[in-house]
Structure formats: C-alpha cells, structure tokens
Amino acid sequence: MKYLAINLGPIIKTFSMARKPKEFWAASYMFSYLMECILAHLQKEKNSLELISPAYEKENKERKGNEENPLVGVGLYPDRAFYAVKQEIDINSLLEDALKSFAKDIVLDVDVARNFFRIMTVCQEYPSSSEAIAGLNKALDVLELNQVAWDSDTFDAILKYLRKANTNLPLYKIAFNKDYYSIGTLEEIARANAKQIDYSYQRYVCIVQADGDCMGKIVSSKQMDGKLNDFSSRLIAFGNDACQRIKAFGGLPIYAGGDDLLFIAPVCGTDGKNILGLIGEIDEKYQKIRDYVDQLKVEDKIDEGGKTKTVPVHTSMSYGISIIYYKYPLYEAWEIARNMLFSNAKQVPGKNAIAINLRKNSGSDFEVVMSKSLQIHYNLDDLIRFTPKESFVSAVAHKIRANEQLLGVLPKEEPFENLDKRLNAFYEKIVDVAAKSADETTYLLKTKDTFEFIYKDYFIEKKRKAEEAKENKKEYREATIEEDMKSIISTFFSVLRIAKFIKGEEVKDE
C-alpha cells in the first residue's frame, strides 16, 4: 500500500528570527496552525486518504478549550503528518489550497507564505503502517537537509510579521480568541510575579526542550499497527495537560506537539516549587503514556554478542535545560537547551535524563547531566533543600579541589572496595565534619553521598565505553587519572553551584 508523509519547515530558521518570548511563541504557532490547516483540507478527502498521525478533529477539544479548560494557546500539532493512500489524488493542489487558507487566516501575503514555508512530501509503498512510519521518517530526514535560500523581501516580510507579536497579531485571535494576548518578557517570566527581587535566580529563566524517549521505535513497531491515531490523541492530551501545568507554574508553553515540549519558565515558580519540581509534575502527566506503551508490550531487537535478542521498549521523558540571564539572546539559549537534550540527556544509558546548563551573567558556566532513575537526581533535590550560606559551599568545593591527588588514590573498579569508609575518613579529617553545625553537617553528608555517586558512575561509564569501543573495534583513548579526577571534581562542583543557585543566592549587580 502507498503511504504519504508531509513535513513542514524551516522551523529552526524561523526560530532564529525571534528575539522575545512573544516572537518565539508566534514562530512556533505558525507551523502548528499550518499543519492544522493541512489536516483540515485533507480530511475532506477521506475516500482517498486515511490519516494515521497526528490525530485530528474538526473541533479539536484540546485546542479549542471550554469553560473548565480555556484555550491552551500553544501549538499542539507536530511538523509531520502520515497518511495511507487509498487512491490516487492530486496532493499538491490540496496542499496549495491549505497554504492559501493558512495565509488568509493569519493575514500573511500568500506569495510570502508560498516562498517561505516548505511543505515537503514523500509517497512510497510499504507493507504496513509501522514500516511506513519508519521508512518515511528517514526519507523526510534526508529532505530536510536540502537548504533553501530565501530572497531578502521574503525574509524581511516574515521578520516584520513576527515583530507584530509585540502589538496585534492575527495568531492571537486563532489561539486565544482575543485580538491581543499578553505574553510576558523574559524579565517578567524570571520574576514569576514577585514584586521585588530577593534572589539572583529571579533574573534568570529556564529554556526547556523535552522529548519522549524511544518514540521512534515505538511508533514504528508492529505493536502500534492500527493504533497510531489513538496514540496521537493520547499524546495531544498529554501536551495539553503539560501546558496547563507549565502555565500554573508561571511559564510560557511554546510548543507541545506529541511527545515534544518546548517552554520558558522561571527557576522558581509562582507556586513556590523549583524547575525540577515542575519537571517531576510533567513526568507524572506522562505516566499515562508510559503505561499505554507498556500495555502494548512494544519490543525491539538488538544484537548482543553476535546474537539477536528481543527486548521490551519503554518510554520516558528527557529534558535539556538552559538557565540564562534574562538579557541573554533567546535563540542561543534555545540552541543550548537542544544541545543539552540531544547531545547529553539522550546519550545517557537508559535515557530518562535531565541535562542542565547554567550560564551565569558573570561568564561562569556549569553543567550537570543525570539520569532521573539514579541517586544523583535525588541528591540534587536534597542539596537544594539543605544548601547553607554561600561561603560554606565554596569552602567545601575548595577542600575537594585542593585534595585532588589524595582523592585520586580511591578505588576505581567495581565493587569499589572500602570507598565509603575512605570517603568518610576524608570528610572527618580533611573537611572537618565535626566542627560544623547540625545543618552544615547534614549538608556535608549530602555532598559526600553526591561525590561518591559521581565518582562511581564516572568509572562505571568509563569502563562501559572502553568495552563498547573494543567490541566495535574502534579506537579509544583512555583518560589519565589526573584527567579523570578533574572531570569528576568539575561535575561535583557544578552540582553544588547549580543547587546553590536554585536554592537562592544573594542578589548581586549583574
């Protein structure tokens, strides 16, 4: 049977034009609404096309809202759609009609829309919908690599249109049923409605890019045949729930298409919780998706020692978080968040991870990558809760750094014999736990547990990478002990600094 895939662009190029949250939101919403217009026009051709994904209803309750659940005001449609082709059809003519309708609705010159937006299509034969999704996604990935140059008039017209987000924009009427909708500045989002600035984090915002793990394997699995439309409906409902929670926190949802989330949020929200607490609540909303996938018993085949092995596939959410000063360029912050997600969090074994980059206005840069299923995730929560005054945190970090060589003689292979006892002795003799107050002692013990975990995890991962390289016959340069310790201590210091920052540092001139 023939299958059709549709892909929209240029998303990244459009986002690069945005300077303010309003413009960032508008850039995202345009693509979601364009997809909605395409789905609406193709729905009229049910005899020729059968929609596989995403789910679409003429009166989409998730986007339209009701009295109990007002308009979400965020794009809920992804940039790709998939159809089964039941009989030949002039798809280009239908897409042209959809584009004209889109341009009319958002009050954009149709020639500008035609010249700027890329509506890419691929139509190929496949034996099943699951195989079609896998194959068509690869084909679309290749199509996206083809760059298109725009003339200056088209570029300027889109830029001018996005700037309208600061006054009146037709997209507001579509998204919120209002002629104008107030979207806060980065400074306003950072403050989270606080009347005065008491902590430095109130001058910083979080740009968060999140993505469902193993989703490619899931949607292209045999177990998903005939169920993709229902699954898409569940993902849209999740996106709606996540957006409502982000808004309640004081954040701004930018995009919620399927398992993909993009939003801007304060470090600490209007409800008193911090950004990690918000992520925990989004994960709770995602639990329904996890349960659904587990019920389907999705499987994948992997090669293990030259033999094919069938393993269950589970899903979770991974996050890339860029914490930046409110005057930092928004697009660059988004690039950092994307890099933290796809180059860091998604590379953690088992995924289900958070990767945080804190870029201080002073120029300091701190990064932490952690699995939510491992102890360091809970250690960070504890460190935030028990972090004492600034000078004490710096003193602990200094003690660790000053004794790098001493710590370098600790055991480096499992089962890490006597590591706990030797670290206890180090903290008693060098860090001087006994001389501290009860709160400071609690904090120190938390830092010891954190260091121990980071230390063990580093060498376990180092061994895994070496074995993987050997198995795949690839070159592998083993780091020296000095390099090992510098990396471990750098990660440890970043965890302490990020915990202290989220807990609340004194306001300084920045």
Protein language model regions, located:
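Regulatory and interdomain segments flanking nucleotide-handling catalytic cores
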Residues: 1-510
